[in-house]
Amino acid sequence: MTLEATSEESRLEDDASQTDRSAAPAAQSAALQHALSVLRRLSEAVKRQVLGRDDVIELVIIALVADGHVLLEDFPGSGKTTLAKALGEAIVTSNEDDVDGSLGAIVPFRRIQFTPDLLPSDVTGGSVFDANANHFHFRHGPIFAHVVLADEINRTSPKVQSAMLEAMGEKQVTVDNATYHLDKLFFVIATQNPLDLVGTYPLPTPQLDRFLFKITMQHIERDAELDVLDSYKSRRDPVAADKLQVARTEVLKARETIDQEVVISTAIKTALVDISRNLRADERVLQGNSTRSMVLMLPALQVLATLRGRSFVSAEDIETLLPRVLGHRVELAPGVAELSRVLKDCMREPMEQLARATLR
């Protein structure tokens, strides 16, 4: 074989490799396409009730399907309750779901208004004495729901916050030395008002780390705000809302399908680890992100890839979600104003290496 032939063969191999990296997304399986349809129906159900918040709705649904939780920083009247309620009521439970009767106390949506005088039992529930039967029985608290809105979570005591921490991390609550399990779909949307810090208890780092995303909500666009005023009556119509609902089992099945079928290559994991290590070593960073944050991010990347019509995680998914995942986890040194600049610098080399890798 001549040198010219060898060179030409190498060039063709390089071209083929480059074509493979830039090719159209691999076709999704029938099961993955069904999972995508479940996510789209769920998204559409929420969008009919919450206008002008498409980006926030997408992140919230990603967190739900990825088995994470969301922290919203917002102002009063921004639609957080409507969003959480719409999501909870879009998920329905049939009698077939409740084979063992364990879902009897689970409701679609609960709102917990956190105050300084709130007790852990006000959240988790507690033992109540039944005089007729002469024994105690457990009264389920508002935390037993598919979707829980923890409103102004930073206004309650650390003791109540720790009760929430157990529920969010372990999907269970402990009352009087007895453990009660929450639903597999248990999902928390917590809020805090960044403008009013009087009488608050800042969330400790371990609890902040339990939230997959921290989302800062802004005022919606002018046209969307007009749509809200024009359609507020129709959006309250329960008949219209019933047409767009998703079964609880469908959401859980979609979660399982996405976990099994969306590929996360070694190159993606390597990039995440290298970015994290760059952040921890950067002199502008006082505290980097934990390994757990990367573990929590993996299923979120899979869900986003599914929403984008792919069966594998790409560099684009990392660029989209990483700022959302790290925004509340990375502590900058005094005088460093922008995390985005630090993150961009720390991502540059790992993402350049990722661009040369095969992802599926």
Role assignments for model-derived ranges:
Residues 64-115:
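Walker A/P-loop
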Residues 70, 148, 186:
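Conserved beta-strand position immediately N-terminal to the Walker
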Residues 95, 130-133, 155-163, 168-246, ...:
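Canonical AAA+ ATPase core
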Residues 3-5, 12, 21-26, 81-85, ...:
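C-terminal engagement/docking regions of AAA+ P-loop ATPases
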Residues 59-62, 129-149:
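Conserved alpha-helical scaffold flanking the Walker A/P-loop in AAA+ ATPase domains
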Residues 32-75:
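Pre-Walker A (pre-P-loop) alpha-helix and adjacent loop at the N terminus of AAA/AAA+ ATPase modules
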Residues 74, 151-152, 163:
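Walker B catalytic acidic pair
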Residues 25-36, 49-50, 200, 214-289, ...:
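Conserved C-terminal "switch" segment of AAA+ ATPases
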